[in-house]
């Protein structure tokens, strides 16, 4: 299932291959509950996000498992990232999902903290649409902020997630 990493790469995750097909690349984020890596599906060559959390960490009740379940229950709606796989790998909970682009906060800062009125209206409409969809499925997102809205990548770069 997981192959131990022998060389020292730019990531701190101890496994290089997950679920026999996802190659872990570099660390792209770290939070209080876990670490996010970019990776590649070795079958399709698609770039993915690999979220990890240590199993049994303090103040943690399988947050990734809950996230995987919730995202899977919302699948198919524009702006909900795809979940490819969730599982446990020797001391870690691991969620493999669609890799997204920059957060709204990053884009706002990149634009010198100014969005046009048209951009604000489009983003507000997309945010409301997403939040309504999530609420219609009895899920309450308790951390709504620009850092938690992401844009897509490639041919999906105009989609808000």
Q: What would you call each of these model-derived segments?
A:
Residues 135-153:
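Catalytic-loop of the protein kinase fold
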């Amino acid at each position: 299932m997981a192959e131990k990493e022998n060389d020292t790469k730019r990531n701190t995750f101890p496994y290089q291959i997950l679920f026999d097909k996802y190659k872990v690349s570099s660390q792209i984020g770290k939070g209080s509950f876990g670490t996010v890596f970019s990776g590649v599906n070795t079958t399709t060559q698609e770039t993915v996000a690999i979220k990890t959390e240590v199993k049994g960490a303090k103040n943690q009740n399988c947050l990734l498992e809950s996230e995987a379940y919730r995202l899977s229950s919302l699948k198919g709606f524009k702006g909900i990232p795809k979940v490819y796989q969730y599982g446990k790998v020797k001391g870690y909970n691991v969620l493999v999902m669609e890799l997204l682009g920059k957060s709204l906060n990053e884009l706002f800062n990149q634009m010198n903290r100014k969005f046009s009125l048209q951009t604000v209206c489009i983003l507000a409409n997309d945010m409301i649409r997403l939040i309504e969809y999530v609420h219609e499925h009895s899920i309450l997102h308790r951390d709504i902020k620009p850092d938690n809205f992401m844009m897509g990548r490639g041919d999906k770069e105009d989609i808000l997630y």
